Amino acid sequence: MILADLTTPAGIEKLVQVTGGTQSYYNHPERADGIATVVQQAITANPNLAHVKVRLMPNLPNAFYNYDRGEIILGVVNPDALAHELGHANNLRQEGLYRKILNAANGVARINNVVALPAMLALRMFVQDPERRDDILKSLSAVSAAIAAPGLLEELSASTTAFQHAPNKLRAVGTLGPAFMAHMATSMMPSAIYQAGRP
C-alpha cells in the first residue's frame, strides 16, 4: 500500500479492517474519514509523499516512520498520529546533511541508552576522586543531551506540523502531547542517569 491509497474509501476500509475496529487510546476507527483529509493535505503540499509506502500492522498500538526504509508503519486509525508520521516523512525523504546528522545522532543515542547506567555505575565504583568523577559525569550528561537534541527537534517539528493541520486542536494535544513526552523521557534518560550519579 502507498500513502495515496489512504485517500480512497477502499484504502480507509482496509486500514480499519487490519488495525481493528476497537477504540483505544490511539485507535479511533470513528475518525477514519479524517485520515483521507490528512493524507490529501500532505500530498497537496508535497506530491512526492503520494508514493511513500504504508505498512499496516495489526496489534500495533501506534504509528511510526521507519527512517531506514522510508515507510510509515500504521497500526491505528488516528489522523493526528498519521499527520505526525507524515511530518517525519516530509522531513526525512529529503536527502542531505539533515538526514545524515539525524541518523548518526539516533544511532549514537541508541547506544548511549544502553551504556549510560553501566557507565555511571562503573565511574562511581572505579573513579575514587569525587571531583574528577563529577567532571566526567557532568561532561557525559552534557554530551548525552547534545546527542539527543537532533532527535527531539525532529519529533517537535513533526508534532508541530501535525498540530497545525489538526482539525481538532484539543484532541491533537491529547494524542501528540503524551507521545512527545515519552520521546523526551527516553531521549533524556542517559543525561538524567549521568546527573543522578554525580556526588
Label each residue range with its predicted role.
Residues 1-10, 139-142, 148:
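Hydrophobic secretory-pathway targeting helix
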Residues 2-79:
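Auxiliary, metal-adjacent structural segments of Zn-dependent hydrolase domains
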Residues 11, 83, 131-135:
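Short acidic linear motifs
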Residues 53-55, 98-102:
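ATP-binding/phosphotransfer module of carbohydrate and carboxylate kinases, centering on a glycine-rich
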Residues 71, 75, 102, 109-111:
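Catalytic phosphate/metal-binding cores of nucleic-acid and nucleotide-processing enzymes, i.e., regions
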Residues 80-96:
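Active-site recognition of the HExxH zinc-binding catalytic motif
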Residues 95-99, 168-171:
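Coil-to-alpha-helix initiation sites in intrinsically disordered, low-complexity, charged segments
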Residues 106-156, 160-199:
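Long, well-structured alpha-helical subdomains associated
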